[in-house]
Structure formats: structure tokens, C-alpha cells
Amino acid sequence: VRIGTTEAGKDSWDVFVDEAGKAGITLVTTNFTDYGQPNVALTQKQIDVNLFQHLRFLGEYNVASNATLAPVGATYVVPLGLYSQKHRALADIPQGGQIAIPNDPPNQARALFVLKAAGLIALKGGRATPSAADIDKGASRVTVALVDAAQTPLSLKSIDGAVINNTYLAQSDIDPKSALYADDPTSPGAEPYINVIVARAEEKDNPTYQKLVDVFHSPAVTEAYAKESKGTQLVVTKSGPDCAAILGRIEQQIRSEK
């Protein structure tokens, strides 16, 4: 099975590949450095499945590309946090400070909600997928800099803070528990951010791909990911149809805001 990810090279990924092998599935991994690539590769049949994204990211891709990629099953959900090398608490971030956030629309929207909940920005318009253009500058304490998600850890050296996805925390040796603020992955509002294994719509019920979801939830893989996320990652066992129902609501919402 040809699988695309942004996580190859991590110990947790190696454990997943090993456990799949024990279950009779040989995984051939293609690692992508850019979040924009794995869905295109899947649509173009260069890979069979991918594992790197949450449901909102998938919804944005499907709507923008008129695609029908579908969730096979859920894997996990993680909090999204604000990190800083310059400040030790939210209160230390100065008026007019600058925070880096991911520039892709779904992660940008979630990062803005994190900053809003942390009391650093105000948003106008009430959109479900806000962008930096929806920030009420007059009512906000900080400004945001949009950067590629992979670059957010590097920006910590030069500005007040950054909202960083879990994928890049481990790669940058940042402790997930050092976040100045993070959203709550157990809240109903976190449903769009459930990560999923994804296939082309016509292959979403492929028994081998379904088995991959089971492998992901095996004790060895669960333990490897828990170790890497320092216990911040929550296992989610929703089925493909359950995930598809959430995805349908997300896509409807995105279309209504276009």
C-alpha cells in the first residue's frame, strides 16, 4: 500500500510501518514536506492513502479542488498551541507583539481561534473559517504573520510567539506541554480537527485500508504516538461513515462562506 504522509522519519511512523507489516500490510511511504502535496498525489493516484490531515483540512481541499477524497477512519486529535521562546506567560506578550501562524486556510482558521481564546486577538464577521483578514486590528493585542506551517518553529527565534502544529513540535524538539495556551481537543468544537486516514472515495471501504486504521490503534502504535506527543494526543476511534458525516457538515459550511 502506497501511503503519503508528512511524518516519515519519526519513531512513531516507523512503529506504525512495522506493525502494519506484522498485520500483513507492506507500507511504501512517500514523505511530503508541504501540506499541499499529499491530497494532490492521492487524487492523481500516485499514492493509495494518506495520513497527515484533519477533517477540516480535507474539507478545504475537496471544496477548493472539486474532489471527493474520503475518510477511511479516525486516528487521533491533538491540541493546537501557542509557543514562545521570549515569553513565559500570555500576560508577558506585549501590545503590538507579533505571532506567526500557519498560512494554509484550515490551520490558519484554527490558529486564529486559539489566539482569540487566549485573548490576544478579536475577530469580526463570525465566519467558521476565518482568515487573517477577519482580525479586528483595533481590538487586538497582537498582529499575525502568515508563514508556511513547517516554518512556524523557526519563527520563534525572531518574534513573540508562534502557533505550531504537533507535526512540527517533535521535529523541532519543542515540548507540547510548554505551550502558553492550547485549545481543548476534547471539546465538540475540536471535531473538525480529528485526524484521519484518507482514500479516494471509490476505495474508502477497501478492507486493507480499514485494517490500517486498526493497526494505527494497536497498543504499540498508540504508545509510540503518546510518547512523542508527551501524552497530549487523544485517540479517536470514529468510523469512516462517522467521519464522513462530520466532513459533510464542514464542506457545507465552507461552501456557504465562499
Residue spans for each PLM region:
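Beta->alpha turn/N-cap motifs
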Residues: 34-35, 45-46, 50-59, 76, ...
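A conserved helix-loop-strand patch within extracytoplasmic ligand-binding domains
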Residues: 72-122
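Short helix-initiation/N-cap motifs at beta->coil->alpha
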Residues: 29-40, 127-154
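Short, well-ordered beta-strand elements
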Residues: 1-8, 25-31, 97-99
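Extracytoplasmic "Venus flytrap"
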Residues: 1-17, 35-37
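Ligand-binding "clamshell"
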Residues: 60-72, 87, 158, 163, ...
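An extracytoplasmic/periplasmic, membrane-proximal ligand-sensing/linker region
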Residues: 8-12, 156-161, 173, 204, ...
